[in-house]
């Protein structure tokens, strides 16, 4: 029938992604192989909201520590994005984190990634020039550049 269609929708518990900025104004980026695009990708730290987890902020704090080893003293909420509106329910909550303290990574057994530091402006320009392919990273860097954050933790 005209106007009717069948849709396949991917159900997703949601995710978080963090623009973590050092005192030297460098942003933490992780470099890892992504099977879906068959390539090594440079992106901001991120991760899924675990089943039963209801607070994206707590998930963001956990994921930053697990992936990079860092903890943050100040956190700003940047906003949320729906990266695949045509076929997925996924929402990614974006945060900016500053006043970082280094620690030890706590990666999942199947995770292998390198943590790198890039000057924020260099990372932003890489995203603006199309040199990064990860949508959440591009969006979060653009949002942080415009300082659209609201401080959540003193």
Where are these regions (language model features)?
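Unchanged
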Residues: 14-17, 48-135
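A glycine-rich, hydrophobic loop/mini-helix early in the fold
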Residues: 15-44
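Acidic, metal-coordinating catalytic segment for phosphate/diphosphate chemistry
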Residues: 1-17, 22-23
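Short linear motifs in exposed loops
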Residues: 8-9, 31, 136
């Amino acid at each position: 029938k005209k106007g009717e269609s069948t849709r396949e929708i991917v159900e997703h518990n949601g995710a978080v992604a963090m623009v973590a900025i050092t005192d030297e104004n460098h942003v933490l980026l992780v470099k890892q192989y992504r099977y879906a695009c068959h390539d090594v990708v440079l992106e901001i730290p991120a991760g899924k909201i675990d089943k039963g987890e209801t607070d994206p902020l707590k998930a963001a704090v956990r994921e930053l520590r697990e992936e990079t080893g860092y903890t943050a003293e100040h956190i700003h909420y940047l906003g949320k994005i729906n990266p695949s509106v045509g076929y997925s329910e996924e929402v990614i909550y974006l945060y900016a984190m500053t006043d970082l303290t280094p620690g030890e990574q706590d990666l999942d057994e199947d995770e292998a990634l390198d943590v790198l530091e890039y000057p924020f402006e260099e990372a932003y320009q890489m995203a603006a020039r199309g040199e990064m392919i990860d949508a959440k990273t591009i969006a979060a860097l653009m949002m942080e550049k415009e300082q659209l954050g609201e401080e959540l933790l003193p």
